[in-house]
Amino acid sequence: MLYGALTAGIFEECGRFCMYKTVMRRYDGRAAAVTAGIGHGGIEAMTVSAASMALYLVFALCWNAGDTDALLKLAGSAETVQTVAASLGKYTVGYCLLACLERVSAMLLHISLSVFVFAAARSRAKRGYLAFAIGLHAIFDMPAALYQFGYVKQLFPVELWLAVCALYALRSARKCYLEECDA
């Protein structure tokens, strides 16, 4: 789990770093960091949330229409149909709110991480921000991995942790943006 969280941090933050050193090297204004963070977080939110929501919507429409053949074709097996149906049955307003909290937290984190990595890419003296971003990313991802593997049973503490991490990252990134990042 630690390996997975750390790997995600390394690949995403080093990817950001390479992006700032190559594709965005001409964008020297610090606002580029915020823009890149919004783009990264926004695309992730769309791919993670929209893809699963679209699947649930198609599944629910087939279920309500009584089209079991389409469900089996979509799911591949009767067991998968039962699993998705049980999952849809647990989909409450509270779950939707937690999903929104997670996406907002992830957006704030991606904006913050982009600011740190931008500072690291623009100044050798600030390369420590890259390691900080990798570590913060891993810390952010760890509770979700613990939940997925069953070590944490409740979703609310995980989402609360993500929100706290995102707010800490945002506060730290604001300081970096205002005081330490090149204008």
Question: Where are the regions that the model predicts?
Answer:
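Hydrophobic alpha-helical segments at protein termini of multi-pass membrane proteins
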Residues: 1-183
